[in-house]
Every structure is written in structure tokens, then in C-alpha cells.
């Protein structure tokens, strides 16, 4: 497996730059494999034993690696093991929804060390958004036994997207308090660390690309269905955000089978959302005569119905629910794959993953009937707080590039 090098200063090919490249390769190997001996690092990098020893001594002196334990159970003397120093830097992520802000802090190895969830006040609140952000972050930082100043970088995930041309949040009218034109400046003044913002579904795609079903794939679409219906587009290995950040806002897409929704951003909905969003599942179940529909939030009701339907016999109302829902999903997805022709489509969010392989198979079959491209469909692997996991992965990637750069 290849290991990307950090950006380095200086002239390419100089000993300083080559040492920095070797350092980064070794650090990436330690992140991937866990504790390694000098001999093992030498074999994985192709470096001689003396060079590997110098490298580890250099990284240990810089505080980037720690000596930890020894190998046991092998012939010969026990070998010293080395690992990345987990406390060398920390990164944080936030997942913002209308209901709550979820925050987490991870050490540089990716291990989550602090977590906090803050209920988000309703539209009529005296608590400014900046205070909501700092309160959520402080809760996670405190749980990790750290302070704000210990966090190297923060990534904030929200519905919609901040338009890079105006600095204002778009496509998320249901997120109260986040639409001020000065919000980003206010956050920058309140936070001691650099921060970035990203669309929540884009962060799920990043999590799947780094940790889950889209590893080793550079062209894929992630379809998300939970509180809202959206997509993330990864083209040539990079997220495609569009001119205003709105690429992938497919919930607004007009589709057959539902009335046209006009002024979609004011309505905060569109044809595909109305046809196949999670809120449509309980309604469809009632139309099919399915009883015992769960009460409570529609996301939870939809997930429970889909899980029940996937476990039901192949015939009957539950199977008709899955078949009809699969057709609706494929109707909108066909437009996406016809334009983008991706290698892979990842299904994520409880409005999709709860149907498991049964729903995936039905959507795959329907899509093959409706679109010329035939990408492979898979169910996403990152199920636990995927937006937050993506935010942490994004923050960690930049943090590692900065902290692991030994050329400076």
C-alpha cells in the first residue's frame, strides 16, 4: 500500500526533504499498523537498519513517537516497539443538526478521547450560535481532560453549505441562527484554533472513503437519507462541491411521481425529498395497510419499518413497502448516475442502511432498469455518528500534514 507524503518545504531531492518524506512514511505506517519494531519499519519502508534507527531517534527526539513495550514470543532478543505519540496533537469535529450539536475530540492517532452532545435550542432562543458551538466544543474538550488551546484544528459539519462567494449558509433554512453574514468571522474570533466548515453529507463520504465502503475508490456517489435526502459527489478522489457549495443537494431534484415543488429553498424540500425521504416511509406503510407503525420522530419510525420489512417474508405488504421504496430511490438516483457515471454508489443514513442488503439489492435492480450506467451499490460501513467521524477525519488529515512535517 502506498503512503502519501506530506507537503514539504525546500528543494525536492535534498537530504532534508528526503528525510522528511521518510519520516512521514514511517509515521503513516505506525498509524496504519500500530506499534512496530525498528526492523519491521525498515522492511516496510525499504530503509537500512542504521537509517531506520536514525529515523526513529529523530522522531522520538521530536516527540512524535514513543518507545512502547517489546516484541515477545519470537526467537532471539525482544525488540523495542515504537508508536505514534497520541498526545502530540488533537483535533475536533462538530455535527450540527436542528435538534442538537454533537462534538468529539480525537488524538492524532484517530482515537476519540472526548465526546459531548448539546441539545440545540429552538428558533426562539437567546443563546447565540457562536456560544452553542463553543459550549459543545468545551464539553468534548473537558471530557477529554484538555483545554481549548490543546485542539489543533476543528471541522464543523452542517446541513446545506456555506457559499464560498458570500460566506453565508445556503440550502438549510431549517437550521436557525446559522445564516448571519458575519457568523464565520464571529466564530473565528471566538475559537483559538483554525476551523473549517463542510456539508454534513460530504463528511459522511469522507468517512466512507477513509474508513469504510469507498476505500480505494476515487469516483463514487454517496446517497444519504436520514433527516434529509442528499448526496456527496467524489470525482477524481476529491469532493465536488459546486460553485455555491450546493452540489449534491438532490432532495430538491424534481422527479416523476410527485408534484413539482417550486421555490424549493423556501419550502426546504423538493420532489426527490417528498418522494423518497425518510418521512415518506411511514406514510407509504400506512397506504399499504401495515400496522403498528412506530410513534416518534419520522427518522426512527422509518428505520424501524425498514428493518422490520427487510426481515419479513418475501411476499406481503412489507416486501411491497421495500419494493416501492426502492423504485422511488432509484428514480432520483438514476439522474445522478446518468450524469456522473460513478464507479460506486454508497447508501448511507438510517433511511437506507436499515433496509440492509435486501433494500440494496432491490435498489440495484431498479437502477439497472432506469439508467444506462450500472454502478455497483453498497451499504455504507460507517454507521456510528458518520458525520462526526468524517469531521474528525477531515480535521485529523490537515493536523497530521502540519504536525508530521519535519522539514521545517
Give the label of every model feature segment:
Residues 1-70, 74-121, 125-147, 258-408:
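ATP-binding/phosphotransfer module of carbohydrate and carboxylate kinases, centering on a glycine-rich
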Residues 74-75, 83-86, 147-148, 212-217, ...:
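Solvent-exposed alpha-helices and their adjacent loops that cap or buttress functional pockets
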Residues 91-95, 151-155, 220-224, 230-232:
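Short glycine-aspartate micro-motif
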Residues 98, 203, 227:
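Short, glycine/acidic-enriched loop or turn micro-motifs at the edges of active sites
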Residues 107, 164, 234:
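Short, acidic, Ser/Thr-enriched surface-loop or helix-capping motifs
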Residues 112-219, 358-369:
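Glycine-rich phosphate-binding loop and adjoining helix at the ATP-binding site
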Residues 161-164, 202-205, 230, 240, ...:
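Short, active-site-adjacent cap segments at secondary-structure transitions
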Residues 217-276:
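Glycine-rich phosphate-binding loop of actin/hexokinase-like ATP-binding domains
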